[in-house]
Design a protein with these regions (language model features):
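NAD(P)H-binding glycine-rich loop region in Rossmannoid oxidoreductase-like domains
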Residues: 32-35, 41-85, 95, 113
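A conserved pocket-lining segment of Rossmann-fold NAD(P)-dependent short-chain dehydrogenase/reductase
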Residues: 176-194, 198, 202-206, 210-211, ...
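N-terminal Rossmann NAD(P)H-binding glycine-rich loop of SDR-like oxidoreductase domains
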Residues: 1-19
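Conserved Rossmann-fold NAD(P)-dependent oxidoreductase catalytic core, especially the SDR/UDP-sugar
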Residues: 88-133
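Active-site Tyr-X1-5-Lys
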Residues: 129-155
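Glycine/proline-rich active-site loop of Rossmann-fold NAD(P)-dependent oxidoreductases
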Residues: 139, 151-153, 163-172, 206-217, ...
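Glycine-rich NAD(P)-binding loop of the Rossmann-fold in SDR/ketoreductase-type enzymes
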Residues: 49, 78-89, 128, 132, ...
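Mid/C-terminal beta-alpha module of Rossmann-like enzyme folds, strongest
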Residues: 209-271, 289, 305, 309-312, ...
């Protein structure tokens, strides 16, 4: 597994081990491994941007989960080097292995499709028109699999806005604001969301099914929520009475570079990244998950309120709220 030390990846490691799988994660020397240090798994030293370092990592593995990606790159070209070329390196290492993996799952993003617009709900057949460099790089990573012509059995899952314990991005900055008694009004947009546990279950179900080979899937909770519904659910999850404040997007565009600079200086994830503002600015990210429900019985066990309650409790226990 690549990205096994991260937010989603560490939860995936736990779930796979609980199911009896033997897990090997790709790690770099400077990776923060706190979430997986106590798990009975193997580690392979390597980096997806260095193809030569991947040879040993993919040797004698049955399945590959490719979750590693860069989200907040200071240089736009890093998105394509890590997300696009990194996927190509990993795929080539798999193909050159004496015993190539039987399955390969890529964790992509709805950013690879671009926003749906107010009156559409995207499914997997919708044309991809990514707007951000991140979205374009994830689209590039998907194309690396489409070029394989059956040489490696692959599956792509496109993830929506994922939240849950251990996340320092996504909904976490908004939850911190709500915890201070403020609900931001961000227009009438809608987006699909997903609790991390449901995403993990979905990825495992997808790679265990023979129906999913050569297919792309949208997974997450359906139907989408309005941002007002999300903000209200956050306040309830933390038992907070919050006032609604309209925050103009042009102000967010002014704040985000300052937040990014402070984050870079402090070597921490910025409170507000320009990529997040762009995501919010294009307000409608509506997707249809029925193909996943049909092909491998995907379901979201956690509704937004349930997932936020679990998430808020974890943040509180970690003294992050």
């Amino acid at each position: 597994m690549t990205g096994g030390t991260g937010f989603i990846g560490s939860h995936l490691c736990e779930a796979l081990i609980e199911r009896g799988y033997h897990v090997t994660i790709l790690v770099r020397p400077d990776d923060d491994t706190r979430w997986v240090d106590a798990l009975p798994l193997a580690r392979a030293l390597g980096d997806i941007t260095d193809k030569g370092s991947l040879t040993a990592a993919v040797r004698d593995v049955d399945c590959v989960f490719h979750l590693a990606a860069i989200l907040g790159a200071p240089d736009p070209q890093l998105y394509f080097r890590v997300n696009g070329e990194g996927t190509r390196n990993l795929v080539q290492a798999c193909l050159e292995s004496p015993r190539p993996p039987r399955r390969f799952l890529l964790a992509s993003s709805i950013a690879a499709m671009g926003p749906s617009g107010k009156h559409r709900t995207y499914n997997e057949e919708a044309p991809c028109r990514p707007l951000s460099d991140y979205g374009k790089s994830k689209w590039q990573s998907e194309q690396e699999l489409h070029r394989l012509d059956g040489r490696l059995p692959w599956t792509i899952v496109r993830l929506p806005l994922v939240f849950g314990p251990r996340s320092k991005g996504g909904l976490f900055p908004l939850m911190r604001v709500v915890n201070k008694g403020i609900k931001l009004r961000m227009g009438d947009g809608q987006t699909n969301v997903a609790y991390v546990g449901d995403i993990v279950d979905g990825m495992i179900a997808a790679i265990e099914s023979n129906n999913t080979i050569g297919q792309t899937y949208l997974i997450g909770e359906s139907p989408p929520y309005s941002w007002k519904e999300i903000m209200d659910a956050m306040a309830r999850s933390m038992n907070r009475r919050a006032i609604s404040i309209r925050l103009p997007f042009h102000l967010l565009y002014l704040i985000s570079p300052i937040s990014m600079a402070i984050g870079w200086l402090r070597r921490r994830r910025p409170f507000l990244h320009l990529r997040n503002v762009a995501y919010l600015r294009h307000r409608y990210w509506r997707v249809d998950t029925r193909k996943a429900e049909r092909d491998f019985d995907y379901t979201s066990r956690h509704r937004l309120a349930d997932g936020l309650a679990l998430t808020a409790r974890w943040y509180s226990d970690q003294h992050l709220l």
